[in-house]
Structures are given as structure tokens and as C-alpha cells.
Amino acid sequence: MDQFIKQDETGDLIETGMNVANHFLSAPIQGTNSLSKASIIPGVAPVLIGNPEQKNIQHPTASHQGSKSKGRGSGVRSITVPPPEAGNGGTQIPEPLFAQTGQGGIVTTVHQDPTIQPTGSYRSVELAKIGKERMINRFVEKPRTSTPVTEFKRGAGSGCSRPDNPRGGHRREWSLSWVQGEVRVFEWCNPICSPITAAARFHSCKCGNCPAKCDQCERDYGPP
């Protein structure tokens, strides 16, 4: 025999369902508790208790959010940038272009051609360009001493160690800058066994074969 729900019973079921919905909307929800028979108020229709574990509503608390963000942040590594040229050693030249003779180097000024006087907003740029060209040509015209280039042979010698320097020697270095409308050059000598660095530095001999002074840097230290 079929059972039919009367119209007034349908209204009662709808009203009961609305009461249950209002109850759960107004009651505080605990994240660790699930919907069970004990959480439903007495008097509601038994059909609404068919599957109490169907929905388990959980709201993350502040502690959960903190631990979640902390977990993501733990995978981020901080990048540490080493100081430039930290392992090159040597002594930094603080003011190479204002140094005086007798401190291990010589300061010279590359004089400009008096007939060439650029004007305008790019005057300093043009003067610096002219001074650089004249400085380069001045050094190119002078004879330079160079170390002999050995032929490369695969597997010969130790690949990681510095090549032997039985004779030793010095190399001339220059530091160029634009100072107060003039191109100034500071030049000095370093042992050929020392590294070549971007910053102006005094280096000491590492191989034990480089002389303390050479014919190029004798005048750098002033009169004897």
C-alpha cells in the first residue's frame, strides 16, 4: 500500500527542516567535532539523521594557518652574497688617484689638448673620452715587458695549481678615473704571481721568486 504525504504534512516537514538549518547556522561550529545524533536537538524528523557523517565542516583556526604558512616558509632559503673579491687578498688602495709618490705608486694627469674644448651638457663625457684615448695611446707607445706564453699541453703539469714561476717578476697596473675635470692615472707594480683584480690593490709575492722592486717601480717609492 502506497503512502502519500498530505499537504499539511509537507508543510510540517519543510518547517522542521528550516528549524534544523537555523539551529546549525546559529550554533558555533567546532573544527574538531563532526555532526552526530547528539548534536541534533530533540524533536526533529528522524529522516534528517540518516547520514550524520556525510559532511564534516572544519574551519582552519589561527594556529593552523600559522603552521601552514610556516611550513611553506621553511622551504625558502636565504641567499648570502659573499663580499666581492673576498678571497683575492692584497691591500685595498683607498684613494689611488690622490696618492703621492713614495707610497708605492705614481699619480699622473693626462693633460687635454687645449685646442679641443667640447661644450654643452656632454662636455665632461667628451673630455673623459679624449683623456682615455690619450692615456691608452701613451701606454701603447711605451715598450712593455711580457712574460713568455707557454704552449698548452693537455695533462701536462698540475691542472689546479698555479704555474711555477722560477724567474719571478712584476707587472704594471693602472687605475683610471675622472677627477675634478681631469683624467688621472695611478700606476704601480704587483708580482706576476698575484691575481688580477678589478679594484686597485697592492699584492705581495706568493711564489717567493718575485723581487721586491723592479726597474719599473723603483721610482714609485721616491728617492732612495
Curated annotation (Swiss-Prot):
Main location group: virion
Gene3D superfamilies: 4.10.80.340
Keywords: Host cytoplasm, Host-virus interaction, Inhibition of host innate immune response by virus, Inhibition of host interferon signaling pathway by virus, Inhibition of host MDA5 by virus, Inhibition of host RLR pathway by virus, Interferon antiviral system evasion, Metal-binding, Viral immunoevasion, Virion, Zinc
TM region(s), chain numbering: none
Molecular-function GO term, any one: metal ion binding
Extent of Polar residues compositional bias: 54-65
Compartments in which it is found: Virion; Host cytoplasm
UniProt effect for mutating E95D: Loss of host STAT3 degradation and slower degradation of host STAT1. Loss of interaction with host STAT proteins
Swiss-Prot/TrEMBL GO biological process terms: symbiont-mediated suppression of host cytoplasmic pattern recognition receptor signaling pathway via inhibition of MDA-5 activity; symbiont-mediated suppression of host type I interferon-mediated signaling pathway
Pfam families: zf-Paramyx-P
Residues that, per the record, bind Zn(2+) 1: H170, C189, C214, C217
Residues given in the record as Zn(2+) 2 binding sites: C193, C205, C207, C210
Positions of the UniProt region annotated as Disordered: 54-98, 145-172
Any GO CC annotation of this UniProt entry: host cell cytoplasm
Subunit annotation: Interacts with host IFIH1/MDA5 and DHX58/LGP2. Forms with host DDB1, CUL4A, STAT1, STAT2 and STAT3 the mumps virus V-dependent complex (VDC).
Family statement drawn from the similarity comment of this UniProt entry: Belongs to the paramyxoviruses V protein family.
Name this polypeptide is given: Non-structural protein V
